[in-house]
Amino acid sequence: VFKIKISIDALVNSHYNLMCHCAYISNFNIKRNFTEQKEETAFWSVEVKELIYLPIEKLTEGMELARNIPGINPMLPFAVTGCKLSERMIGRMKTIGVQGAYICTSITQGIEPEDFVEPELKAKMLTSIRDVFDQSLKKFTFQSSRQVYEEIAKVAESVVMNVLNKDKYLFQMIDIRDYDGYTYSHSLYVGILGVLLGKYIGLSISNLNDLALCGLLHDIGKTDIPIDITNKPGPLTSDEFEIMKQHPSLSYKKLGDHIVISQAVLQGVQTHHEKFDGTGYPFGLSGKDIPLYARILAIADVYDALSSTRPYRKAWSPRRIFDYLTSCSNTHFDPELLTAFLHCVSAYPIGTIVHLSDGSSAVIKDNTPGFSLRPIIRFISPPQKAGIDVDLSSELFNLTIIDDDEC
């Protein structure tokens, strides 16, 4: 815990979102500071608490939330920053599919996770995506289809600007989401991940906007699939899977019939389940015959899906996801794009707790591009190592992270 001073003017002019960054007003003692011009400036004394991310099974009663837990409505959180967890709350979080939470601690001073998308912007994006999907369930009119396009185009532009404004290519986000909101958050993150990869390989802003639209709309055809199939809490039967396989073409038709959108976007949406070796659907395209946007979306789609807890399975561990993606190079995925993608994402986001091969525990301090599975860590146990920082990408340290499913 440490204290900083922030000018009230700075708070107003810079729109500091203290709650989202785990800052708490500890003393409402206004100090007077007169400049040479005798202008008066007031300061708040602000106490900033550090945080770590813990998976749901590690949460215990009495822990203090360091960030909001979103509810079904993105604008209305299930639990707010600063509240103390109870056993009942933890049980409810498990029921709605929350994977973990940021918790206040004094262990990680100087380690601050950076939101890839600011929470307020993310909530607005998710609300817009939900509105678009809800509208797609109704009969489109000329006016409603134009409104849908304008709304989703604004989200796409926000996604692109958000990615372009990031200095780092590394995507590191722990998404605290519920089952009911999966479709919307999945669409958003496929858009973000696609644009991130597109930026890395040098696509133009116009192409990035198209790519964002592809990601945001790639699953909109699922609104025409029976809900007992899309929301089935278990593996699909072969007949159900054949119905589910129709969603790329349904997305293409729904968008093509009602919304003025580029052919490149439509093709990307329609072919995002094609595989590099020709075994995908709906057309069995292979290699570079698959549109570029679709080859990018294929990677982003699978990565986000495996990173997410679903009603019928837990989220995969980072190492398992990376191993799976690598094993699918040149079969499911374009190998060049996959190599680039793995440079763009971090397996272990800053602030997460990990276990190491020597039995010690650590918190992720930072990540190095190209070494996603070997980040910079800070030991938290055993006591004789606590507080020591180590870069696992260095050959000097023969340590590896042991994922939960390996313990």
Segments and roles (model prediction):
Residues 106-245, 250-260, 264:
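Acidic/His-rich, divalent-metal-binding segments that scaffold phosphate/diphosphate chemistry
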Residues 48, 73, 166, 261, ...:
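Short flexible coil/turn linkers enriched for glycine and charged/polar residues
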Residues 28-150, 382-384, 391, 395-407:
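Membrane-cytosol interface segments
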